[in-house]
Regions:
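Proline-aspartate-enriched helix->loop->beta-strand connector
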Residues: 66-71
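His/Asp/Glu-rich mid-to-C-terminal helical/loop segments that flank catalytic regions of hydrolases
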Residues: 199-229
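Alpha-helix C-terminal capping segments
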Residues: 60-64, 82-83, 180-188
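Generic non-transmembrane alpha-helical segments
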Residues: 18, 124-139, 181, 217-228
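A C-terminal functional module that forms or caps the active site or interfaces directly
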Residues: 152-198
Length: 229
């Protein structure tokens, strides 16, 4: 089974509408829609914005549906000169950019327990997402680190700090927490993001303007991934 998680309705609703033999289960306030797309077993959920919402959703999905793979899909802010609005980022690994125990001597982003800064994605899954994105000719697509934090990135200073600390190519608010949960449960995962803004001082203007278009593109790539998986 393929598990797909998005933070907002706009990031998952079109995929939910594609489900055949659809079943709805509500757990801890989150709706999980399961069924088939292209004869593949799929479960889809809108987790809500932020790392805690995403982690609750991912853990519940794993315990309830036992997916083979988790995909976090949606929009993000670009942290790379190679990614313009509506270009595509696929994660090779993820990092929680707002995790900070540096006063205790840890590196920025260090997660105690798993003792990692960057959580590795399943490279086979990331490569398949990349191949699907490039074959659809939906814009430039690059592989790299995707950073997550409980902040909407809206300043050049925030952007520079994340780039300097982690070399991330895109910033958002859920992927690394989903990756953290997947990693601890030994479930393959990756993150697919389409750029809705440049994570700069104008992102609050660009985001509402380009969010829908970026989300449509991520859904198209997810559908191709499901068909190819």
């Amino acid at each position: 089974m393929i598990g797909i998680i998005g933070a907002m309705e706009i990031e998952v609703n079109a995929l939910i509408s594609m489900l055949e033999n659809k079943t709805l289960t509500k757990i801890s306030g989150i709706n999980y829609y399961s069924g088939k797309i292209s004869d593949k077993d799929v479960v889809i959920a809108k987790c809500g914005v932020g790392k805690v919402n995403a982690a609750i959703c991912a853990q519940t999905m794993i315990l309830t549906y036992s997916p083979d793979v988790l995909i976090n899909t949606g929009v993000a802010g670009s942290l790379s000169e190679k990614l313009n609005i509506c270009d595509i980022a696929v994660a090779t690994d993820v990092v929680q950019h707002d995790m900070d125990t540096t006063p205790l001597g840890d590196p920025a982003g260090f997660i105690t327990g798993i003792d990692l800064v960057k959580i590795p994605c399943d490279i086979r899954i990331s490569q398949l997402l990349y191949n699907c994105a490039t074959s659809l000719n939906e814009g430039n697509c690059i592989l790299g680190t995707i950073a997550s934090g409980d902040q909407f990135l809206n300043s050049d200073a925030q952007k520079k700090k994340i780039i300097d600390n982690f070399g991330a190519i895109a910033g958002e608010m859920e992927g690394a927490s989903i990756g953290h949960v997947a990693y601890m449960n030994n479930v393959s995962f990756s993150v697919l993001r389409v750029m809705s803004d440049n994570a700069s001082g104008e992102s609050n203007i660009d985001f509402p303007k380009f969010c829908e278009l970026a989300a449509e593109k991520s859904i198209k790539i997810c559908k191709s991934f499901i068909e190819s998986y």
